[in-house]
Regions:
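Sec/Tat signal peptide C-region and signal peptidase I cleavage site
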Residues: 5, 17-22
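Early extracytoplasmic/lumenal segment of secretory-pathway proteins
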Residues: 23-90
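Extracytoplasmic ligand-binding site segments that recognize negatively charged/polar headgroups
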Residues: 33-40, 83-214, 220
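Paired acidic/hydrophobic, glycine-rich loop segments that form the ligand-binding mouth/hinge
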Residues: 75-82, 208-209, 225-230, 246
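A ligand-binding cleft/hinge motif common to bilobed small-molecule-binding domains
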Residues: 88-90, 226-243
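Periplasmic-binding protein-like
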Residues: 126, 192-201, 239-264
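Mature extracytoplasmic/periplasmic domains
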Residues: 254, 263-323
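Conserved C-terminal helix/tail region of periplasmic/extracytoplasmic solute-binding proteins
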Residues: 319-348
Length: 348
């Protein structure tokens, strides 16, 4: 009984002490849903177990205006945010995000192209890919974007993203432009005309989509036999729903990254930088990609992911030979004009 009372007293003392020295949580802002859950289960819970620092997750839509408003008002509530690269570029230039040093991120040479930024480290790496229905084509499905455009060899409607970005790249790959040469070609008026000419040739066989659920529904209903799409959602449909879809990685693809960035003047700016330093360790980055079919920024992290699951990720070494990063600088400079031309073309 004495031992039991002593143990209880000790536990209460420790609880009281821990209460006095409680550590404030770091507020991390992501994209919600299964993405946030994968980060919680694969990364943040491990960080809390390792450091004792709790993580509070919030969801947003990536609006840099929200960060700007908080910083300008001197009332920052976000510590670490996942943000798309164009918004990161704007925020970094405006001083809304904290510049990162190699002490935080590690050696830049260890990152895939496009996954490390002056103010950010890749929170995920996704790809736009060619997917087809194996119930229709079996193992003899399209293996290139030229095949995607070949409606005689592969009859049926195609699902295509209703925006210039992503679609123009696919059109030029169908016309023989290699991913490595893409933005040299797209930077010329002749290259843009060439992409739209390819779209002219496929137009009657296109079913346009403007959201991922719509793209999946088009495949599910049989309205289209193949589509462009995002790799993680297709993997989810195949692995969890057992749907008959296959990604043709060898067709060529472009990948992009969302970025973790620390908000300037964040209430826990130092802790957020420490968290980002911890996250930059390959094993910690791999925690997310083991649960969600987006890749990592660190090259070494791929070695820590089981081979059967790694095959679903755009950053798998066997897939990267066919992939290139999106040129974010090109799209920041040209997106408005190209999207306007694309909308006018759609309306014809």
């Amino acid at each position: 009984m004495i031992l039991k009372k002593t143990a209880c007293a000790l536990a209460l003392t420790l609880f009281a002490v821990s209460g006095v020295h409680a550590v404030d949580p770091v507020t991390v802002v992501g994209w919600g849903g299964s993405w946030d859950k994968a980060y919680k289960d694969g990364v943040w819970d491990r960080y809390t177990a390792s450091t004792g620092i709790p993580i509070v997750q919030e969801e947003w839509g990536g609006e840099v205006a929200k960060v700007r408003a908080q910083v300008q008002a001197g009332n920052v509530t976000y510590d670490l945010v996942s943000v798309e690269v164009p918004a990161l570029e704007i925020g970094c230039a405006e001083g809304l995000f904290v510049p990162l040093t190699p002490e935080i991120t590690g050696d830049a040479a260890n990152y895939l192209p496009g996954t490390l930024h002056e103010c950010g480290v890749a929170s995920d790496t996704w790809a736009t890919i060619l997917v087809y229905n194996t119930d229709v084509f079996g193992d003899a499905g399209p293996a290139s974007w030229a095949d995607f455009w070949d409606v005689k060899k592969f009859p049926g409607k195609r699902g295509v993203n209703a925006q210039a970005q992503y679609t123009l790249e696919n059109a030029l790959m169908a016309d023989g432009v290699k991913p490595a040469d893409m933005y040299r070609v797209l930077r010329t008026p002749e290259g843009v005309d060439r992409a739209f000419a390819m779209l002219d040739g496929l137009r009657e066989n296109i079913v346009w989509w403007s959201s991922i659920p719509q793209a999946i529904q088009n495949l599910d209903s049989g309205e289209v036999v193949m589509s462009d799409s995002y790799n993680a959602r297709i993997t989810s449909e195949v692995v969890e729903e057992k749907k008959p879809y296959r990604i043709a990685w060898q067709a060529g693809f472009f990948y992009g990254s969302d970025m973790w960035a620390v908000v300037k003047g964040a209430p826990h700016e130092g802790q957020a930088l420490d968290l980002l330093k911890w996250f930059s360790i390959p094993d910690n980055q791999a925690g997310f990609s083991k649960l969600y079919a987006y890749g990592t920024g660190r090259r070494e992290a791929a070695q820590l992911i089981p081979a059967d699951w790694l095959a679903n990720l755009p950053t798998a070494p066997q897939h990267l030979q066919y992939g290139m990063p999106y040129d974010d600088a090109f799209w920041t400079e040209n997106k408005e004009a190209l999207e306007e031309r694309f909308k006018a073309w759609l309306a014809k």
